[in-house]
Amino acid sequence: MGSGSNNNTTLEDLARLAGVSVSTVSRALNDQPLISTRTKQRIWALARDHNYPFRHYMPAGPIGAEGSIAIVTPHMRGRPLPLSHPFILELLASIGEAARARDCDFTVSHIAPTNYDDLVHATTTSRASGVIFIGQSALHEALNQLASTNARFVVWGAQMPGQRYTSVGSDNLLGGRRATLHLARLGRKQILYLGSTDPEAMQRRAGYSEALAESGLEEDPKLVVPVDFEWESAEAAVGRLIRRHVAFDGIVASSDLIALGAIRALRKAGLSVPGDVSVTGYDDMLLSRLSTPTLTTIRQDTHEAGRLLVSRILDDSSDHMPALLPTDLIVRESCGG
């Protein structure tokens, strides 16, 4: 029916034509975030064709595109996670490729949330179809609170107890366990753990503890060292341990960047990797393949992560359960076997 038709069309008529519920039509006409941009645009087109009065919203993203996505990085330990971090760059690239495959635009927001109000601001000030938060930081309960609203969002991060929001992340517990078991099987007895205190790193630490117990090794509190997410923090921490004559023959790092910082400190002290100390990382960034020695690490599937994060925003699906991606041990030169 063209623009010359009468204006007696009802919400029920639009719902029947669109093959959706009346409530979905109502939400779409009010541009509510729980409805995907594709569904909104289909309902808006029907409303226009049938002269149904509504506020004409501009589509998010390029004309004809499926929508747009905003990417937000919360504060980590009191400051924004740097977008220049190699893993963040790889994850952003995967999100971008997945968005392009769906003819969807994406933007990286300047907002770095530290509390619930910041999360609300991030999800309500954007014209995007939804928001991808990179990491939970200390915002798990605030994200649970946000999930009770109409905000459309997904989190890259750990699965947490009592979680009510959708997340995509890797099996951090298994990844930490695999890295530690590998060192134990190589005969390493005094294995140092270096990691930040964000939820993902803490799960990797739990895997480290499980593997030590499974290998009959006692966990030494002196060998569990919190570090920042930058390589400089790891280099400084390992340097201090060496100067204090704390003995260790293996390192499980919660990221590749932390592992590379540790290797710098070992080299400055005249120690050989892997001759004196075997080192494992986590992420399998490009740098891990280019370093000397090349880095044994735990691979996260960022390509699949990007695809799932984008689909959780754009697809009308009731299957918004958290997704746990497998991790793989990638053995290279830094462990010597």
Q: Where are the model-predicted features located?
A:
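Residues that mark the start of a beta-strand
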Residues: 68, 188-190, 249
